[in-house]
Amino acid sequence: MAALRGGDLRPRLTQGSRGTERRVTQESFPEIREAVRKLCARFPGAYWRDLDRERAYPTEFVRALTEAGFLSVLIPEEYGGSGLGLRAATAVLEEIHRSGCNGGACHAQMYTMGTVLRHGTPAQKQAYLPKIATGELRLQAFGVTEPDAGTDTTRITTFAKKVGDKYVVNGRKLWISRAEHSDLMVLLCRTSLRDEAKTSAGMSVLLVDMREAKGNGLTITPVRTMLNHATTELLFEDLEVPAENLVGEEGRGFKYILDGMNAERILIAAECIGDARFFIDRASQYAKDRVVFGRPIGENQGVQFPLARAYVQMTSASLMVDKAAELFEAGEPCGAEANMGKLVASEASWFAADMCLQTHGGFGFAEEYDIERKFRETRLYQVAPISTNLILSHVATHVLGQPKSF
């Protein structure tokens, strides 16, 4: 498929369906969705099961998405992307996950580059964005979290000291996904000591060339987890980064990172919607096919009701995510909507996962059905990025006006 361009696949609403499902909401970007489905069909469950066993990176899948232009939908056309916007990006990720694939290996390329796009210099944008769009450069790593600074980003201690025409970085990062498979990393670090009166001040963003950094002050250690997410621990020991790689102004990094968080929340929520659809599709078909006591198990309300509830929750969450994406594209404040959308979508996908596993019974635990793999993958999204509890705290404090609880 030729790379996407802005004029190719503008949204046209349709009553499209999947299987025997009669959609109760309109489906946006049908051409994009169909193209993504066709691409994902080339990477069936066996492909993902093999990678999962070895905890290997889906290089071929990411390359195919890049060549098709799906990972550059948020990059403006002037820099080689399609400039289609966030709603198109949500359609891409939703369909990837509905197809049984996983966008976790590459979704950061969609939103991480936004820091450079919004706050980088013209020279930085021209140097990096066109190459990110073509896949010549991979910007997959987002260095924020530390062992003692997860939810509270203001507690990061990784420090970049300005020495002449470079920064010298020392510190440690944890849960940094795809660092081994990224050419560039957006790194949040301190450039001045933490001020208790202004805890979010004094942080800056550096664009790190991982190809030069590895073995020259940067050590990457893989962290094996319950799912294939290519996450790592990073150790910085006098890593030198050119001063020209500072993104925006020194000391304003926390604000720059926050600017991209809403897009991240919305895109992850779209993946959750895709996961929920995957589980609902699988459970619905299995309930029709599986015969017990002489009739399909789907004739029992005990099977029907959880399936129906999963669909209701998924559809409701999808509407919330769509609303958040619309606000984001319109340039309107959408922090609450993005966070709430991510919360309800992650809960919908987890309910659907549990329902699907229960519907399949023992078969759900068999690797060949792909349910246990997707079950493990979708559980992550109630923890990261941003935990369910932190979203609830955000809503209580910033929406309902309650006292800060942390």
Which ranges hold each PLM region?
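Alpha-helical interface subdomain recognition
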Residues: 3-4, 8-9, 13-104, 111, ...
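Long, acidic (Asp/Glu-rich), low-complexity accessory segments flanking structured domains
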Residues: 238-255
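Flexible, small-/acidic-enriched active-site or ligand-binding loops
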Residues: 155-157, 212-240
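A short core secondary-structure module
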Residues: 3, 166, 170-217
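A short, Trp-centered hydrophobic/proline-enriched beta-strand micro-motif
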Residues: 135-144, 188
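Hydrophobic, small-residue-rich alpha-helical packing segments that form membrane-like cores
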Residues: 150-152, 167
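Short beta-strand-to-turn element immediately C-terminal to the catalytic PLP-Schiff-base lysine
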Residues: 118-120, 161, 187-191, 207-209, ...
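Short Ser/Thr-interspersed hydrophobic loop/turn segments at strand-loop and sheet-helix junctions
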Residues: 69, 92-97, 189-190, 207-213, ...
